[in-house]
Amino acid sequence: MKLVRIPESKYYDYRIQAMFDCYKWDPQFCDSNTLSKYALILTKEENEEVIRLTKKLDNETRIAEKYLNQNIRIAKKLALPKKILEQIPKMQNYDDKKNIRLMRYDFHPDINKGWVVTEVNSDVPGGFAESSLLPELARKTINNSELEFISFGERMVEAINTKLNKKGTIMMVHCTCFSDDRQVMQYMGDRLKKEGYNIIYGAADHINFKEGQAYCILDNNKEKLDLIFRFTPLEWLIQMKPRRWDGYFNCMTCSCNHPIAIYAQSKRFPFVWNDLEKANISMETWRTMLPETIEVNEVGQKQGFIYKPVYGRVGERITIKEACKGDEYIKIINDVKRHPKQYLAQKRFDSLPLKGDDGKTYHVCLGSYTIEGEHAGYYARISEYPRIDSYAADIPVLIEK
């Protein structure tokens, strides 16, 4: 794995094209450029290894979530929000054959053991355009035809066509006030529109449910839906009023993702592995790849642990001290003390940085997608610090032939 520089003379045009042609509407976060000046190159062997590990992790995760859905007593250990726990009985009609299951596993190169996986983005993983259009733009800019890439968008289109056969209405459900959410949905919606689908963009509360079927309630679009493509996190969705959201949990309309995704989205997922293994469900790959994860109150005098929120996203509230800004670290520690059940402790691994030709070193998070159990491409980000957060830069992933 290595970094290859986007030629300095071409970077300005590359950035403009990323914004206007590749849906990269958030190229800046505060004072940080969030579009890397590099491409990440995987060897053929590295790509094959990550795909193999990703599929094994995904198989374990999907078997586990089905079991948890039938065993509420065990699922309670995940510290699911009360409103979601109340909905679990409604999810007993879940049929994986009628839905599309999308996940993304976060791989990190480790100095000592090759790869570690820190979590699975089980509910609403993003980065669709960055993992579909940006690699093609980078390859063209670098001018190296010996590099290839996997387009997430094309894999997703294939999965949806299998379910809907290029017919029907799809609602792209997202937080409509956020442009960075809209860019994810706009790319996927535009691509699906080319396949012949009727695409509607709306918020989670723009759907009503009748006898398990989803209907759009927007003016000029009041119709039955054939697919809900959701990018609103479940823990946000359940705060919405009026309370129409409970229809998502027993919905018979094809969904990507169905709320069953909440089980693995909880970072407390490792705390149910013993129960799963007692039911003869192997978590061998997860145990091998995830750093040691324990309850906050078990840390005591143990060294080398960091705290992570149970439902954190984009690296927020993780206590990697050198990556924290201002009094952020102290605030997180105080919050951990006040709300220990909202956090967990994870053994910090030794991230292997990659060196750029600017003399700086960069830490990598390689997000590996699955759709319906099959590998579906990469979404990667890099940072000068070993915490991949909102300040990190998106980087296209290319693969040596």
Where in the sequence are the language-model features?
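Preference for protein termini
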Residues: 1-401
